[in-house]
Amino acid sequence: MFFMKTKALFLDRDGVINIDKKYVYKIEDFEFCNGIFELCRYFLAKNYLLFIATNQSGIARGYYKESDFLKLCDYMLKEFVKQDIKIDKIYHCPHLEGCECRKPKAGMLLKAKDEFDLDMKNSIFIGDNLSDMQAGLNADIGTLILVNEEKKEGDFFKQCKNLKEILSFFKEKDI
């Protein structure tokens, strides 16, 4: 019997899911980016699993506790559920440089691959930094999208200014 591996949409948190205000850990500072819910619903309809992969060095720096981060995750997941969106899992790196999970290393992405038997070549990673793109390359993710208004150079598939532009791109390609 032949089983197809599952495709995944990986999302960075700060700058993709929420507006990046540097070290966001309080609910009152968390503001969803325009278009995130529509983008996620599109990929759910295409049978992708949804994952968040986020560096959270503010924990190691002592700016906030892991419990603060987890409380914000709980709030965020509930807001996604209100929009009929299931995030399959959140992966986070609470460390500073030097660990295997911190992007641009691929530890978080490879953990998801192993836990969910993912088809990385047919998966997508959307991030707002070149370190996200490098992590995606390191994990052999097939499609890398950089969402950033500032032109960047790097080994990524496509750069878009915002999430609505990304959604239009995928709809045009019928991905």
Give each language-model segment a name.
Residues I17, A60, Y64, N129:
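Gly/Ser/Thr-rich beta-alpha loop segments that engage phosphate groups in nucleotides
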Residues A8-F10, F51, I124, D128:
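Hydrophobic "anchor" residues on beta-strands that sit immediately upstream
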Residues D12-D14, N55, D128, D132:
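Acidic active-site catalytic centers that drive phospho-/nucleotidyl reactions
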Residues I36, C40-C73, K89-L96, G136:
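Substrate-recognition element of Asp-dependent hydrolases with the DxDx(T/V) motif
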Residues F2-L49:
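Active-site neighborhood of HAD-like aspartate-dependent phosphohydrolases
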Residues I27-E31, Y64-K71, K103-P104:
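Alpha-helix N-cap and loop-to-helix initiation/capping positions
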Residues F2-F3, S67, D74-K89, L96-F125, ...:
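Asp-based, Mg2+/Mn2+-dependent phosphohydrolase catalytic module
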Residues K21, K26, G58-Y63, L96-E100, ...:
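A short acidic, helix-capping loop that chelates divalent metal ions and anchors anionic groups
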